Regions:
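Mixed-charge (Asp/Glu-Lys/Arg
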Residues: 1-47, 52-142
């Protein structure tokens, strides 16, 4: 995981936010295709819906938020832009392994921030803490 303030670099060039977004989106698409889901991408991103998943004759809308920075040593904060997407998919790297957190968007069309704890907090607090491991089940996992 990259610390706050450090960019993502490739061959000596910092990767743009747009490029990081495409990388995150491809991580999610790869995961969904391996699960045998049908995945569709809108031509434009006017409504902040990155993917449409067809699964069991249902459509599920997804916004992808690729996260490469830690807000402190053990958690990340994800800023969600106003979207009508049902789910927020958040690819993250924990101990050199990539996971996708799936967060149900219960605040549609509102801007908000949600925090996820990536490791045990120093104060051992567990109440009202979003541990990333609790968000690894995708909406197509039965």
């Amino acid at each position: 995981m990259i610390k706050k303030g450090e960019g993502v670099w490739l061959n000596g060039v910092e990767i743009s936010r747009t490029r990081k977004g495409y990388i995150g989106q491809q991580i999610v698409i790869d995961y969904l295709l391996r699960k045998n889901a049908r995945v569709y991408e809108p031509i434009v991103d006017d409504f902040r819906i990155d993917l449409l998943i067809e699964h069991n004759k249902k459509y599920i809308s997804v916004q992808v938020k690729y996260h490469t920075t830690m807000s402190n040593g053990s958690s990340i904060q994800v800023k969600v832009a106003p979207t009508n997407a049902e789910w927020i998919a958040i690819p993250v790297c924990v101990k050199n392994k990539t996971y996708i957190m799936w967060y149900e968007n219960t605040s549609k069309n509102k801007k908000y921030t949600v925090a996820f704890q990536m490791s045990k907090p120093k104060n051992n607090q567990v109440k009202k803490v979003n541990f990333y491991k609790l968000f690894l089940k995708s909406p197509i996992d039965n």
